[in-house]
Amino acid sequence: KTMKIIKVNILLCLLALVLGSCEDFLESRDKGQVLEEKLFVNKEGVEEAMYGLYYTIGAGELWGAQLPTIMDALAQYLTLGTYSTENSGGFEELMLHNHESERSTTLFGGIWTLGYKLISDVNKILENLDSWGYKPLKHMDLYRGECLGIRAFMHFELLRMYGSCNLSKRGIPYVNNYGMWVTPFSTTRECYDKVLKDLNEAHTLLLEDENLLTYPRKPVNAYDQFTSYRELHMNLYAVKALLARVYLTRNEPGDVDSATMYARQIVDSKKFPLPTGANVGPDHFIRMMSGTVAQDEGIWGIYKSDTYSALQSLFLLEKGSFLAADEKMYEELDPARGTDHRSNWIRVPSASTPEVSEKLGMRLMKLINASVFNTANKEQAPIGYSGSNIIRVPELYLMLAETLLEKEPTEALRYYNEFISSRGLNTEESITKEDVDKQFWREYLQEGQYWFRLRRRQVPEI
C-alpha cells in the first residue's frame, strides 16, 4: 500500500427507511439532550434522559463527525484537497502530528470535555435509578445496563486516546459518581479493571437482548418503543464486542482467550450476517453505510438525522475537503484475487452534471448519502436508519482471524475467508497477521478504528 511514512511514537498520550410513525419517534428521541430533575419521576422521563445520552454520543465532536476523522488523520488515511480551510486546518495539523498546536488541542479538548459530560450525564441517571422511589420501572435492568455500558465505552475510548499503553502508568480519571468534585487519575491498569467491572455488570443486566435483538430484526413494538431499534441502543452484543476489544487491548495473560470467546459469541449468534450471494456487489457497498447504521452488520450505531450535513463539509467541498491518501487502497494487482467492492467507498460522485463530477474527482463516499448529494441518485438511497456506526461485525471476524491464528489456524482461516468473500475477494489457503492488518486497514476507513489498532500493535511507523 502507498502511505506516507511518518514516525509515530505510539506511547504518546494523545489528547432509514421505516414507517413514518417510526421515523417520527426516532426524530423525537434525537432531541432528548437535557437532564433535569423533573425527568426522573416516570419511565417517559427516564427514557428521554436515556435518549439524551445517545444524542451526545452522536454530537459533532464525538461520533457525529470529528472523533473518527481525527483518528483517521492520525492513521494517515487522509490528505487535504487543494486549499486548507478553517474547517480543515486542525485536522491538517494532526496529519502532520503537530499535537501541541492550538487547533489540535482544540479538537482533542472537544472530545475530552464532551466525553466527560456524557459520563457525568450517565452518572446522573444512575444516581436517580439507584434511589428510585416512584412507580416500579419495567425496564430498570435495560436502563442501568445501557448506562453502565455507555460509561465503560466512553472511558475506554478516552483511555485509548489519552492514557498510557503501560498498565502501571497514568491512565485517565475514571468517574463513577455524579458531582462537582475532582476525580484523580487512575493508572491504566485500574482503568481497565473499572471498565471491565462496568461491562460485566452491563452484560448481566442486558441479557433480555438475547430475545429483543434478533435476525431478521423484529418489527417495531409500538406499545414499547424502548425495546425496539436495539441496534441503536447500547445492547448486549455491543457489550460483548466491547469486552472483546478491551481484553484484546489490555493483553494480560488469558485476555486473548477472553476476547476470542466474546467475539465468537457475536459471530456465531448469526444476528449480524455478512453479505452473501447477489448482495456482494457494488450496489450493496455504495448503500450499506452511506449515512446509515449498517442494517445487517451494525451491532451498535447512533441515530442521527443530520448525518449528511455533518460530513459534507469534511469530504465533499470542492476545495478544502479531505481526500483519500491512497486512492488505490482497494486495488488488487492480481485479478485472480477477485474484486474488492469496498473500492466503491472511494469514487467520483455522481453529481448533477458530468462537469461537477469531474471537478470533485475521487472522493471519500463511504459515509455519504448519494441520494441526498444528488436527488437523481434514487437507486443509491441508503439501507438502514440514518446515523453513525460505532461497532460493526467485521471487527469481530478479523479479531478471530488474529487471535486464533496460532492456536487454531484452520478456524482463523475460516473466519478470515468468510469475511473477505463478503467483500468480493476470493478465499485464501493461508494467512498471516499482516493479511489481517491489511483487511482491517481497508475495512475501517472513515470509522476511526485503524489508529487504535496501530497503537495496540505498537507499530513504529505508518
Predicted regions: what is each one?
Residues 22-73, 304, 462:
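Membrane-proximal, proline-rich intrinsically disordered regions
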Residues 88-162, 181, 185-190, 199, ...:
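Conserved, well-structured interaction surfaces
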Residues 159-166, 210, 249-253, 406-408:
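Short coil/turn linking the two alpha-helices of tandem helical-hairpin repeats
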Residues 130, 134-139, 204-235:
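Acidic interhelical loop/turn segments
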Residues 194, 429-462:
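Long, intrinsically disordered, low-complexity segments
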Residues 95, 233-234, 248, 256-389, ...:
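Hydrophobic-face positions in mid-chain alpha helices that act as interaction patches
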Residues 1-31:
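Bacterial Sec-dependent N-terminal signal peptides
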Residues 50, 119-122, 192, 199, ...:
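Inward-facing hydrophobic residues that define packing positions of alpha-helical scaffold repeats
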